[in-house]
Swiss-Prot record:
Cellular component GO terms, alphabetical: extracellular region
Domain Gla: 41-86
Localization, UniProt: Secreted
Domain EGF-like: 87-123, 125-166
Family: Belongs to the peptidase S1 family.
This protein's name: Vitamin K-dependent protein Z
Gene name of the record: Proz
Residues modified to 4-carboxyglutamate: E47, E48, E55, E57, E60, E61, E66, E67, E70, E73, E80
């Protein structure tokens, strides 16, 4: 009996060992599958050498943000991919700035901003001016203590929303009236702006251009204002107004041409809008960060026909040009008080006092005035005096 029991125990032990062998050693096909698997832990050195593979990293397996970054090697492209990647969390890239809190959604995210910040990614401080604001100031923006503040150009007032600007009188600057637009469309000649004027000497000869900044003040170049002692302003064919006083910029340098600006005060104001309309002078920050970059301007004025001004005003579309390139092309020094504009054609003999204006949300602003005519037939570029840099001086003289 004892022998039978021992024999039975041996048989059971043999079966157990056989099952253990089957569970430890896999059949050949399964074993081969194991051998063919990509062993990430043992291939770390190779993965660091070669750029990541998107299919292997993020589609055969679920990847993290760092692995996706290895594939694209570019933060912007990686963030865009990560927002669309089904297996990833958009919040991993920490899109919410200034200690904002990120919340994941299906293929998107939202930010809860810290106090004092706003915007999709909490990038904008509520008390600062930002170009990205779609609901910001129509004209000028100023940082405040708890919120930014808006202001308007001369002749406008803030709307109820404290952001929009509406004309408050008939001489509101840079606002083309329906009457002027109708006259422009019916004219057979090139269109002109109601703020453009010509300077005339005592013999009735036109010699320079200017621009109306206020109903009783005209901006021209210092050089033009000093050419004759008896100057009149011609706003249209029938009306000529004599100059009461001339205000040349105190730092005008005749030799270098620096600060080549002058304000001419009229003996009597022009009648708005029938005889003319002022153009708006932009604040410096608004001009240099909002108005000018990447926008198209209009060069307007008259060209020289021999030694005389042509009778028909001209217009030419221009864009801001690189200062270094402009300086090399024109062989001039571009300073903080000058700017360059580039046209689509070679510049003709534009007369001194011709101007560049830009339209912003229905209002026209003055950004440059021409001090010297360009070299004939040589370049598409012009060097102008940067008008916004003198806005405070204008206010002091015209107050």
């Amino acid at each position: 009996m004892a022998g039978c029991i021992l024999l039975l125990r041996g048989f059971i032990l043999t079966l157990i060992l056989h099952q253990v062998e089957l569970s430890v050693f896999l059949p050949a096909p399964k074993a081969n599958n194991v051998l063919r698997r990509w062993r990430r832990g043992s291939s770390y050195f190779l993965e660091e050498i070669f750029q990541g593979n998107l299919e292997k990293e993020c589609y055969e397996e679920v990847c993290n943000y760092e692995e996706a970054r290895e594939v694209f090697e570019n933060d912007v492209i990686t963030d865009e991919f990560w927002r669309q990647y089904g297996g990833g969390s958009p919040c991993v890239s920490q899109p919410c700035l200034n200690n904002g809190t990120c919340e994941d959604h299906i293929r998107s995210y939202s930010c809860t901003c810290s106090p004092g910040y706003e915007g999709k990614t909490c990038a904008m401080a509520k008390n600062e001016c930002h170009l990205e604001r779609t609901d910001g100031c129509q004209h000028f923006c100023h940082p405040g203590q708890s919120s930014y503040m808006c202001s308007c150009a001369k002749g406008y007032k803030l709307g109820k929303d404290q952001k929009s600007c509406g004309p408050s009188d008939k001489c509101a600057c840079g606002a083309l009236t329906s009457e002027h637009i109708r006259m422009t469309k019916s004219s057979q000649s090139q269109p002109s702006f109601p703020w453009q004027v010509r300077l005339t000497n005592s013999e009735g000869e036109d010699f320079c251009a200017g621009v109306l900044l206020q109903e009783d003040f005209v901006l021209t170049t210092a050089k033009c204002s000093l050419l004759h002692s008896n100057i009149s302003v011609k706003a249209n064919v029938d009306q000529r107004i004599r100059i009461k006083s001339t205000h040349v910029h105190m730092r005008y340098d005749e030799e270098s041409g620096e600060n080549d600006v002058s304000l001419l005060q009229l003996e009597e104001p022009l009648q708005c809008p029938s005889s003319g309309l002022p153009v708006c002078v932009p604040e410096r920050d608004f001009a240099e960060h909002v108005l000018i970059p990447g926008t198209e301007g209009l060069l307007s004025g008259w060209m020289l026909n021999g030694t005389h001004l042509a009778t028909t005003p001209m217009l030419l579309s221009v864009t801001q040009a690189d200062g270094e390139e402009c300086g090399q092309t024109l062989n001039v020094t571009v300073t903080t008080r000058t700017s360059c504009e580039k046209g689509s054609v070679v510049m003709g003999p534009w007369v001194e006092g011709s101007v560049v204006t830009r339209e912003h949300k229905g209002t026209w602003f003055l950004t440059g005035i021409l001090g010297s005519p360009p070299p004939p037939g040589q370049s598409q570029m012009l060097l102008l005096t940067a008008v916004p840099r003198y806005s405070m001086w204008f206010k002091q003289i015209m107050k």
